[in-house]
Curated annotation (Swiss-Prot):
Any one of the GO CC terms: cytoplasm
Native organism taxonomy: Bacteria, Pseudomonadati, Pseudomonadota, Betaproteobacteria, Burkholderiales
EC class (word): lyase
Record field: catalytic activity: 5-[(5-phospho-1-deoxy-D-ribulos-1-ylimino)methylamino]-1-(5-phospho-beta-D-ribosyl)imidazole-4-carboxamide + L-glutamine = D-erythro-1-(imidazol-4-yl)glycerol 3-phosphate + 5-amino-1-(5-phospho-beta-D-ribosyl)imidazole-4-carboxamide + L-glutamate + H(+)
Protein name: Imidazole glycerol phosphate synthase subunit HisF
Task of the protein: IGPS catalyzes the conversion of PRFAR and glutamine to IGP, AICAR and glutamate. The HisF subunit catalyzes the cyclization activity that produces IGP and AICAR from PRFAR using the ammonia provided by the HisH subunit.
Assembly and oligomerization: Heterodimer of HisH and HisF.
PANTHER family, sorted: IMIDAZOLE GLYCEROL PHOSPHATE SYNTHASE HISHF (PTHR21235:SF2), IMIDAZOLE GLYCEROL PHOSPHATE SYNTHASE SUBUNIT HISF/H IGP SYNTHASE SUBUNIT HISF/H (PTHR21235)
Active site residues according to the UniProt entry: 11, 130
Recorded name of the encoding gene: hisF
Keywords: Amino-acid biosynthesis, Cytoplasm, Histidine biosynthesis, Lyase
EC number: 4.3.2.10
Amino acid sequence: MLAKRIIPCLDVTNGRVVKGVNFVELRDAGDPVEIARRYDEQGADEITFLDITATSDGRDLILHIIEAVASQVFIPLTVGGGVRALEDVRRLLNAGADKISMNSSAVANPQLVSDASARHGAQCIVVAIDAKKVSADGEPPRWEVFTHGGRKATGLDAVAWAREMARRGAGEILLTSMDRDGTKSGFDLELTRAVSDAVPVPVIASGGVGNLQHLADGIKLGHADAVLAASIFHYGEHTVGEAKRFMAQQDIPVRM
């Protein structure tokens, strides 16, 4: 069984790391280079950087931050936010990113995922899906895809969309539950399991981690291949090392 990954997520806006609840109420968590270096030292498997307002504000890529981080951090970096064209993918990879995450742009232009995967390889293309439950209690569960930092409904079914993105060459799906984001109440395990079981590529569970048990649940009950968290790491509640030791105690294979 492949080792399961623990991935701290850095949401960046205006050059600072921030964290919100349900995609709003952002508070400052510090300098991206310092925070990334700390996670590297703690033994994180990867780091994900999301420029959370680039697409909605129409801003350019955070190349200078990526260059600064890549020069000091030696684990894989996934970068997303403001990726609109094949040229953006190339520029971010050249700046030191290892994987590129697309969200709004994949919905606007699914061919971009196919083209980027064909040119650079599926292993460096991640499609991020922000999903919100839209079915009522008692109905079969259904989740809708949202874009533009969770501000725009698309009408797309999250499970079907994940399948389509994998078919087009996404090497990985980064799945965030908007209902759980920042709530510390645990992953939406039903959503995570539905997508993980539907696609042939790794799924990273995101949104809602409040304790170490939630991370383990994402793997064991959500069938995710990796778990992503922000709040519990940024504000010093837990280190990545503590998370890995906890998961190892639950017989989840991790790189120590």
